Design a protein with these regions (language model features):
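Conserved, single-site charged/polar hotspot
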Residues: 1-346
Length: 346
């Protein structure tokens, strides 16, 4: 370089120093900006999601000798049908057919696991393995689905059958045994520990983040009671100063654990059941002779959130990712491993 006719020479160490300073000026600001990029809904939770379950048995042909005895509550009779036909009727009844295919696969896997575990545990009632109501899993026949879906029947059924066939014969296991694969509609942002809701601890039914549920139309709701009805249902007295009850503790899943009333304490589960609330995540306020209860989520909150599963699927997660997130430490095995122990009817 010539400056004013004089030649200026740069030493090699000086050149390296200048180059490093230029690099720092460019790189450091970029590094500072990147961590503050706005994350997508569910991205943080998804990053913590366990990898897809390994060693998954391929969907296979299921022995049609494995039949499920279903007590049809309305007809007051037992109907016996092949396993995969039963699972199809459950998935169609329990999850919206418009949901992502990977969410429907996760639902099929949970539904099949639920009934296999129930059949292995025995204890029939009304000579049936399960009922067709929410006491177990809702099941509807093809005739009932035709009435429900109308012109959408063919397309909906085809999609459901695809989800079932892609998981045919697969069940979720923990420590070599089919799990109690509970599921529900919508969380409050976290699922619930089984021990906190039912009192029984299951190592695979632990509280996990489920931020995708915020997109559910069932995420929040309000119910209004008269003070008289509220008191009658709960067997408590509401104080004259407007204090409805003191919520003492919350569970790990951010739901009400205990509520103290005057001379009486109820669990969040008891309050939910007595008031028929959508969730045990609730708050309330008194407005004159009314009590307004606001809830977050829909269902008991234990196991797989259906709207959470759909949110994960919409982000590109596979059904194996979904079940690995909601059921901790599980494996996927073939139902054929338990065929000899199942109640087989010919």
């Amino acid at each position: 370089m010539d400056i004013g006719g004089n030649k200026m020479k740069f030493s090699k160490p000086l050149f390296i120093t200048v180059a490093l300073l230029i690099a720092l000026v460019i790189i450091v600001p970029a590094a500072l900006v990147i961590p503050f990029a706005k994350a997508k809904v569910g991205e943080e939770a998804a990053s913590k999601t366990p990898p897809a379950i390994e060693s998954i048995p391929a969907p296979g042909k299921v022995d049609t000798a494995v039949q499920v005895a279903v007590y049809r509550d309305q007809q007051k009779k037992v109907e016996t049908l092949p396993m995969e036909e039963y699972v199809t009727g459950v998935v169609a009844s329990e999850m919206n057919a418009s949901f992502e295919i990977e969410a429907l696969k996760a639902q099929a896997l949970a539904a099949r696991t639920f009934v296999v575990q129930r059949m292995l545990s025995g204890g029939k009632k009304n000579n049936a393995d399960v009922t067709d109501t929410v006491k177990d899993q809702v099941y509807k026949s093809k005739e009932e689905l035709k009435k429900q879906w109308g012109n959408n029947y063919e397309n909906n059924l085809k999609k459901i059958e695809e989800a079932v066939s892609k998981t045919a014969g697969q069940v979720l296991t923990y420590d070599g045994k089919p799990i109690s694969a509970s599921f529900f509609s919508t969380s409050n942002g976290r699922t619930e520990n089984a021990a906190d809701y039912w009192g029984n601890d299951y190592p695979y039914l632990k509280s996990v983040d489920s931020p995708w549920d915020q997109a559910s139309p069932k995420f929040t709701s309000e119910q209004t009671f008269t003070v008289a009805d509220f008191q009658k249902r709960l067997g408590v007295k509401v104080l004259a100063d407007g204090k409805v009850g003191n919520i003492k503790d919350l569970t790990e899943g951010k739901r009400v654990k205990d509520v103290a009333f005057q001379g009486k304490t109820l669990t969040g589960k008891q309050v939910r059941e007595k008031l028929d609330l959508r969730s045990s995540d609730f708050t309330w306020k008194q407005e004159r002779d009314k009590i307004v209860v606001t809830t977050k989520g829909f269902g008991h909150g234990v196991g797989m959130s259906q709207y959470g599963a759909n949110g994960m699927a919409a982000e590109g997660k596979k059904y194996t990712d979904i079940v690995a997130h909601y059921y901790k430490g599980v494996e996927i095995k073939s139902m054929n491993d338990y065929e000899g122990k199942l109640m087989v009817k010919k």
